[in-house]
A protein has these predicted regions:
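A metal-dependent hydrolase signature that marks the N-terminal structural subdomain at the beginning
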Residues: 1-64
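Short coil/turn segments at secondary-structure junctions
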Residues: 5-9, 81-84, 88, 120-123
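Active-site scaffold of zinc-dependent metalloenzymes
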Residues: 51-90, 107
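Short alpha-helix carrying the canonical HExxH Zn2+-binding catalytic motif
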Residues: 88-105
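Post-HEXXH active-site segment of zinc metalloproteases
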Residues: 91, 106-134
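An active-site-proximal "capping" alpha-helix that borders the catalytic cofactor pocket
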Residues: 129-146
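Long, well-structured alpha-helical subdomains associated
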Residues: 145-189
Length: 189
């Protein structure tokens, strides 16, 4: 039986409260049309608002038969600040979702053993985190989501209530607005 609080697009389970934003982000990734993805609200995600990951039960399945989660916190807590997903502008949310879909694009090309190694490296290596986050941003920008990714970066880096520690972490790990603009220009050529 279908949950009345979710919406469905082919092979997707999406909370209704973010269905429009997810649909827009997915429209930039036609190659994910048949990929099973469940967008799910989660109480807490360490150091993040969203997190894409393969379902563990499918890690060793054929790459084409894997399914994924995109975990999303409804209430973001960063140090002493807290705000709700409903306070996030739509284009920012689309950018965040697009970034997470970029991770799924990356995961699809990896073997099961490689995914396990990816997870371990992500947990233990700052350099690896930076590479993975920049790859996800690059996937999103190369899929026509540059404006959304820029809106997300602008929201984070210019949000008065977010700490400088958190903003510095974002600056270190993700593409900068300047790098995003440069990538957009390169893709136009």
């Amino acid at each position: 039986m279908k949950d009345l609080n979710t919406s469905e697009i082919t092979n997707k389970i999406i909370p209704k409260s973010i269905a429009d934003e997810v649909a827009i982000a997915l429209s930039h990734y036609p190659e994910l049309k048949d990929t099973p993805i469940e967008f799910r609200f989660k109480e807490k995600i360490k150091k993040s608002f969203m997190q894409a990951q393969p379902k563990f039960s499918g890690i060793f399945k054929n790459k084409k038969n894997r399914s994924y989660f995109v975990m999303i916190t409804e209430h973001f807590h960063i140090e002493n600040e807290s705000f709700s997903i409903s306070e996030v502008p739509s284009e920012v949310l689309i950018g965040w979702i697009g970034h997470e879909l970029g991770h799924i694009m990356d995961y699809q090309e990896r073997s099961g053993i490689n995914l396990i190694g990816f997870g371990i490296s992500y947990l233990t290596s700052h350099k690896f985190i930076k590479e993975a986050e920049r790859a996800a941003d690059t996937f999103a920008v190369s899929h026509g989501m540059g404006d959304y990714i820029l809106a997300t970066k602008d929201f984070i880096l210019n949000h008065a209530h977010l700490s400088s520690i958190y903003k510095d972490r974002i600056r270190k790990l993700y593409l900068s607005p300047e790098e995003i603009l440069l990538l957009v220009e390169e893709l136009k050529d």
